[in-house]
Amino acid sequence: MIRRSVLALLAVAAMVMGCVVVASPAGAAIDTAVVVPSPNSGARSNVLKSVSCVSTTSCVAVGYYVGASAYQSLVLNWDGTSWTKVDSPNSGSNANVLNSVSCVTASSCVAVGWYVAESGTESQSLVLNWDGTRWTKADSPNPGASNNFLNSVSCVTASSCVAVGTYADDVQVSTSRSFVVNWDGTSWTKAESPNTGIYDNVLNSVSCVSESSCVAAGYYVNGAGTQSLVLKWDGTSWTKLDSPNSGSFSNIVSSVSCATGFSCLAVGRFDNGIGSVDQTLVLLLTGPEPPATTTTSSTTSTDPVAPAFTG
């Protein structure tokens, strides 16, 4: 009786203050890992490189398999019970590889990667769109004469996605430049992205929490070696964030994930300079949080603020 009275008083207090009391979600309760059967195409190598889930009964995994003469795109769908292979388009008869997938609903996914043109020498960006029924190839920019690779994609809505990677500079063909493309629901367009120095700049991963808040990460090469590379998007432009390096020679960021517009983690590896032994690298990216506001029953949520990371 006492407990019910206390709960009743709390409920009344919440209504008087115009606030909604919501129970906190339980912590992670995963305690078991099992191998789930998944289909393979042919008797040669099958590789899954990325997965995206929108519910326990809707996931998509992508990668590639080795066909009769070249790599072919590979897409599997999860329905809560089993994985099934889904037909996915391939451009030409040469290699087609999917590196990353991002879904916002069961009927809206984007997968990105690369394929080799019919000439057999130029790699082109590859983007596939899922509409809930089938995968179709989308037109995507290729700023370089060769080596146009998309390594990662992040979608916040069906009409807002960002994909990142690298392409070969037309002037210095052996030099890679940062590559960012945006999806607005209609077309993919190349965005201007900064490069550090005259040597390689490669983006391996991107994470968006809103249309105006994304972080991309990878590495660039200078005279001292390979350095961590972090770019941030504020809804208007991409800018480089000063990021630390643990190793004196090699620092590579392979993945980034943002929980909010002011809190991200980036991970990868660095060379400790002793016998070329790689060590784990973790970068905490933070920025000033927005001012606290009082939440009332009539308040509507807004997009997270653009990242203002301090390093």
Task: Locate the predicted segments by residue.
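Bacterial N-terminal signal peptides
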Residues: 9-20
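Residue-level hotspots at or immediately adjacent to binding/recognition sites across diverse folds
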Residues: 4-5, 19-291
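C-terminal cell-surface addressing/anchoring modules of secreted/extracellular proteins
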Residues: 291-311
